[in-house]
Amino acid sequence: MYKYTLIIFILSNLYAASPSPVFGENGMVVSSNINASKVGISILKKGGNAIDAAVAVGFALAVTDPGNTGLGGGGFMVSVTSEGEIFTQDHREKAPANSKQNMFLDENNNVVEGQSLHSRSSSGVPGTVDGLINAWTDYGSGNIGLHQLLTPAIKLAEKGYELSHTQANELNYFK
């Protein structure tokens, strides 16, 4: 009996500690950084759509949360337009243009130790910037220019922003 009471007590405390759901009527922006989320909200208020906001948030996160996002990586986008069109975009990194199928093999078709990890050719070409701009070009509202999407991230980079407790701890760890 006490075993089940303890389990119910633990589960009820976990549920009680969960944040309450939040609902929005005209749009909502959620990201890993409040500054980036505010950028997305401002884009929506200026007449942008969800893609405009997502692109602006993506660039802002490259500044405010570079450990989890960044211009040197890639990603995917899965979305639904206001007309109900479902689309996906692949923004992942790509192999360099001069890549060849056997570029990490020697003349005997044996793997060259370390070359696939520690050579210029082993690095992928980032896809984030191109992907975000393509998403905006293909599915943006047309009401917001690229300059308006990039300016908030540039301002965050130039003027700075308050770090979260977690970010401050991470930076202090590497002091």
Name these PLM-found stretches:
Residues 4-12:
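Sec-dependent N-terminal signal peptides
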Residues 17-38, 50-175:
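Noncatalytic scaffold domains of N-terminal-nucleophile
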